[in-house]
């Protein structure tokens, strides 16, 4: 009976290596498709897999062919419509189509639809939050926040050719060939010694010598059939993400839920905060999040109430800033914590309250936070709150502000606010 032993790590997913190579090769096109797809999802469905489409021309192999542009001279036998020097107009319409669903119809021509494939939840989130980090993160005395970094982790039997370890593969090849031929080599050595003795003995034993020479030839043939290198010998450099303890961090999420925030504006604010939550939980470990909702009064709430509560009212933005300052003083020592804040509002505020917001941020919050981001979600002209915050942006480097007009702006604004800088972690 013959037994087959499958030693592949990806036995049930044999194309995993090719899949990873494909994701790396077309990362730019995939990320572009993801940035477009995220705006089409519901508020609660941003962390599942995604069907990604790539234009066929982006994945086609390069090839040389005759160009279709410019002027050409051709001879058309039997032509009765044109004479020499006539210019032939280019055909109008689809002209073959690209399969993208755009353009006009054509009665002839061929094309291909865009290439569509499914990526997993982990692949989706990895690409979604690639090259993002908390700005100005500082290593404090008490280290509880864990950041994941890529490290060498020995060797693996599966991988891409670029990561192959030649030395380790040859060592495995030598060990395998030694183990598979050791017994035969011992037997061969014994037969050669016997043949030497018989050859020197008198009288000559020709039949015995012939038998020994035949056995020696068969053994050498068996030894030579053992391959020099086998797929079982190949070893690849392995990399894995390991937790890297860095520092303590807390993120304050301040959301305006006043009456001026219609449901569409609130949904866009929630999308931004869900992206922020997924980014923090995906990239860091043990980071704390403080949720604050405000209208005329501010209130610290849990995650469920922050996203689903229907409470509303007037607008006094300073109430949220005052509550944040109180929470910082009570629970988060700036010497031990990296403090971050993300504020989302439609910019509508009581006029006399906007200067107070400027004062609280300038004197109390911005001196102690690592990074403060303000996101204004509106299609109207900016009001007093935006203008007061513009003065802060020109004074404080750790203050950033962005404008979201519609749903398509959410992800680009998020990446702009949290793109990875050259020196994110400071000692």
From Swiss-Prot:
The UniProt annotation puts the region (Disordered) at 84-110
Give the highest taxon in the source lineage: Bacteria
Pfam families per the UniProt record, alphabetical: DUF444
* Family in the record: Belongs to the UPF0229 family.
Q: List the disulfide bonds.
A: none
| Protein's recorded name | UPF0229 protein YeaH
Q: Gly residues composition bias: which ranges?
A: 92-102
Which InterPro entries does this entry report, sorted A to Z?
UPF0229
The record's annotation in NCBIfam families points to: PRK05325.1-2, PRK05325.1-3
